[in-house]
């Protein structure tokens, strides 16, 4: 129920993660992101080297909602204090598939990188797939989860 949650799971390759959760809506108190935007979202972190270098798979609520894949790369920086909102880049799938905004209720979000190819499944539907090898080159770290202004209950798993 906190405005921001960040976590990583120690061990594993960091290339696979799943979150089964119930989205209970926006938190009572909301915080702006480093960019200044206020958004309710739940997501997975893959190859999370640190807070400045990783791949995100985020499921956003609201009218501009849906699943978004993005990298955050800031070479030489490792803490959010150092990089803030710098280094984000949205990745586009060569085969775009629509994904619905996150709404209240039970959900599952899964992501897997295999030989540089990312597949994202939301509530059983393939919503994003494509080659991310150039975007993740050199990243090494665990998988994790992230929430912003989203109340959830659920379970997280990784490889």
What would you call each of these model-derived segments?
Residues 17-19, 42, 109, 143, ...:
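Hydrophobic residues positioned within well-ordered beta-strands of beta-sheet architectures
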Residues 19-21, 104-122:
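Short tryptophan-centered beta-strand motifs in secreted/extracellular beta-sheet-rich domains
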Residues 56-57, 129-131:
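Residue-level detector of high-confidence beta-strand sites
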Residues 76-108:
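Short, aromatic/His-centered strand-loop micro-motif at the edge of beta-sheets
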Residues 121-129:
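Short strand-turn-strand beta-turns centered on an Asx-Gly dipeptide
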Residues 50, 113-115, 149:
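A generic beta-sheet turn/junction motif
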Residues 134-159:
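Ligand-recognition surfaces built from glycine- and aromatic
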């Amino acid at each position: 129920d906190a405005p921001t949650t960040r976590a990583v799971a120690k061990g594993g390759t960091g290339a696979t993660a799943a979150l089964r959760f119930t989205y209970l809506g926006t938190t009572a108190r909301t915080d702006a992101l480093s960019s200044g935007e206020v958004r309710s979202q739940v997501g997975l972190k893959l190859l999370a080297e640190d807070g400045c270098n990783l791949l995100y798979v985020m499921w956003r609520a609201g009218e501009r909602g849906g699943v978004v894949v993005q990298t955050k790369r800031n070479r030489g920086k490792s803490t959010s204090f150092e990089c803030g909102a710098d280094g984000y880049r949205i990745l586009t799938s060569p085969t775009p598939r629509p994904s619905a905004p996150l709404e209240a209720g039970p959900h599952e979000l899964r992501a897997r990188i295999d030989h540089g190819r990312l597949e994202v499944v939301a509530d059983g539907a393939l919503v994003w797939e494509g080659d991310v090898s150039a975007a993740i080159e050199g990243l090494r770290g665990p998988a994790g989860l992230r929430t912003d202004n989203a109340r959830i209950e659920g379970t997280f798993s990784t490889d």
